[in-house]
Amino acid sequence: MSPIDITAIQSHVAQHRDDIITFLREICAIPSMDSQIGPVGERVQAEMTKMGFDEVWFDSMGNTVGRIGNGPRVLVYDSHIDTVGIGDPDEWRWDPFQGKIEDGVFYARGACDEKGSTPGMVYGLAIARRLGLLDGWAAYYFGNMEEWCDGIAPHAFVEHEGIRPDFVVIGEPTKMLVYRGHKGRVEMKVVAKGKSAHAASNHLGDNAIYKVLPVIEGVSRLEPELGDHSFLGHGKITVTDMAVETPSLNAVPNGCTVYIDRRVTFGESVEGVIEQVRQLIPAANRERGDVTVEMLFYDEPSYTGFVFPVDKYFPAWALEESHPLVQAGQAARALTGLPDAAPGKWNFSTNGIYWAGKAGIPSIGFGPG
């Protein structure tokens, strides 16, 4: 591999500056909500082809993949290109897909989370190859779906495409710092079963909503008891949704499901966090079995019809600050002239829960926003 010449890199970037900006605006203009990433994936593939990638394709799940080189060492640049929805369009002050530039900042749906990292990855890899920086490497751009189930895309990529990287760079926003980990997550549900009756004769029913109230109250008070870690921080727990089964608005509900998001730090096991919630269920309900808790399971088909079933457990992970990949990220960042800063962490979840948390592949984050 050639020595890094930051001046040469900057010269190439300057030559492509307008194309990079246009590319970003165009991929943000293509809606990719609800994991529908086919059209934006095609646009990304067109740019990779233009920039001389050796191979571009859609994997079985429908994620976009581009490869440069075929060396023995494997590097993956990970950027999810799906987004959440836009909510009520009337509440936007500008078209979220057209976007706007204000004070040198580009605003659009997905500009930060996380389409903003894709142009830098695509052009960065192409420029690195031109400068001889990827000799001995197979380098991949991986534009994937992540919003609805973190880590499922890379998990399927490794198992079904047979590509297991040696190192991963995740493009989630890091404020242009190097990030080296984050808390994990467990999604669970508490299900209560009751008996319906007409509200005028509610004494004949068994209200399922009332059965989950002790759990909701308990969750609201549980956080001080959760685990803590000097780098990753304190565990978190939140009731995020509730679904009620009832014949009508004038009937006693016969079913109620409460959904819980539990952020886990090091030292907290999936079995332990589920048991914490189970202990919030009144003993009488636990004994009768009419209120239960279980981890969620994801088996929704992707837009291609591909199904990859996984439990919704996402482990915490962190690389040591002294790890060679973290140090390489810090060194690369220093070459750009950015102010010195210690490596940080995300306060949300990323595909790192699979790359590093489940597969044990050294991973770092670096991205705009």
Model-assigned labels for residue ranges:
Residues E102-D113, L338-G344:
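Short pre-catalytic strand/loop immediately N-terminal to key active-site residues, enriched for Gly-Thr
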Residues G116-R221, S230:
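Fold-level recognition of mixed alpha/beta catalytic cores in primary-metabolism enzymes, strongest
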Residues I27, P31, E172, V212, ...:
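Residue-level signal for inorganic ion chemistry
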Residues S2-Y107, R130-D135:
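Acidic/His- and Gly-rich active-site-bordering loop/insert found
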Residues M1-I4, A8, K189-G369:
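Metal-dependent amide/peptide-bond hydrolase catalytic core
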Residues I68-N70, S79, K183, G194, ...:
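A generic beta-sheet turn/junction motif
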Residues D88-E102, R180-V191, A331:
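Acidic-glycine-rich active-site phosphate/pyrophosphate-binding loop
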